[in-house]
Design a protein with these regions (language model features):
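Trp/Phe/Arg-rich N-terminal binding region typifying the photolyase-homology
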Residues: 1-157
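Glycine/tryptophan-enriched, flexible segments
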Residues: 137, 142-215
């Protein structure tokens, strides 16, 4: 997902083109409900990772004087509500292609005013889809061939510059609390301290893992 501040298309362009910006995250309720198979779509390990990631994101955004709105309601309810209350003019979000995510996106678009400018983008790939040198029907069936062609013919796009810190007046007066594991029906737990792969959530930890892996 795109829960980071650095090299983020939406964050960079919103900061560049809008006088005030706010970040929004929804804990979609149905992802934490029991399924007919007797387990949740999002269980305790993934939930802990997500909570850690949001704590990191909230801290990073606060350094830029940007509020992270954390919502326990569906985005189909929360986004239209905050668009109205905060008088939002532009909405930035990452494109997805899977059904559940697109159902949410479609519902949000139907629920908000057509005057809202919607900006969508692909920000989750090493290579941007528009930069791939293959036509759709000519993409190799074998990954190695695809990879070698991309390495030879396609350049990874440059990262977006870091945004300038907003004035403190950009922050909302309300402080949004990140839920705890217990709020989702899980008991608090701690990964084994001797684990070789603790995988703590958050972009800073992600960068550190990448650095350790490559260097």
């Amino acid at each position: 997902n795109d829960l980071r501040v650095k090299d983020h298309f939406g964050f960079y362009n919103a900061a560049k083109n809008c006088d005030k910006i706010f970040a929004y995250f929804s804990f979609e309720p149905d992802k934490f409900e029991d399924t007919k198979w007797g387990f949740k779509k999002t269980e305790k390990f993934r939930t802990l990772f997500l909570i850690q990631t949001l704590k990191c994101l909230k801290d990073e955004l606060k350094k830029k004087n940007v509020t992270l709105i954390v919502d326990i309601n569906s985005a189909t309810v929360g986004i239209p509500k905050f668009i109205d209350s905060l008088k939002i003019t532009d909405l930035f979000y990452q494109n997805e292609w899977t059904k559940e995510e697109n159902d949410i996106s479609d519902s949000v678009k139907k629920a908000i005013s057509k005057k809202i400018k919607i900006h969508t983008y692909y920000d989750q790939f090493l290579y941007h889809p528009e930069d791939i040198s293959f036509e759709l029907d000519a993409i190799p069936e074998v990954f190695t061939i695809f990879r070698k062609s991309c390495e030879k013919n396609t350049l990874v796009r440059k990262v977006f510059p870091e945004i300038t810190t907003f004035p403190s007046t950009n922050l909302l007066d309300e402080e949004f609390t990140i839920p705890r594991l217990g709020d989702f029906g899980f008991s608090e737990f701690y990964p084994p301290p001797f684990s070789a792969f603790p995988f703590t959530g958050g972009s800073k930890n992600g960068y550190n893992r990448l650095k350790d892996y490559l260097w």
